[in-house]
Amino acid sequence: MSTLLTAHALHVETAFGPLFNTLSFTLKKGDRIGLIGHNGCGKSTLLQVLDGTLAPTSGSVSLAGQCLMARVEQHLPEALHTQSLLQAVLAPLPADAREAQRWLAERLLAQMGFTPAVMEQQTATLSGGQQTRLLLARALIRQPDLLLLDE
C-alpha cells in the first residue's frame, strides 16, 4: 500500500510540559487508526500538527505529493454560525469552484440526513449532532485521500 503520511520524531512541548516526544509513524492508504487517551493528553494537538495547523516543537510531517488531507473540526467555527449549511459546506473550496460543486454539497448534506429546507438554514440553528454531521460534510467536500477526525 502507498504511504500517505509520515510523522518523524514529533515532539510537542506546552507550558505544562511535553505532550509527546519522538513520536514516529506512517499512515498508508487503507489504514484506520484511533487515538485513545485522557482529556488534555494531546490527541487534538497531534491532529493539528498532522494537518499543519500547528507546528511541532521538533520533528516533521511529510505528506505524499498528491495526497489531499482534511480534518473534521471538533466544534463548529463561530464564523460559520450565520451561514447556511450549504454555504458552510462549500466554504473550504476555492471561491471559483463553489457553484460548480453545489450539487456535491447538496448530495453530501442529503446523505447526512438534511432536507433541502434545512440546507438553507443558518448553522447556528443546528443541534450538536447535526453540527457534527455538517463538519463531516465540510471535510468530505474536498474528497480527501486522508481524513482526520477529532472526536
What are these regions (language model features)?
Residues 1-151:
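ABC ATP-binding cassette signature C-motif
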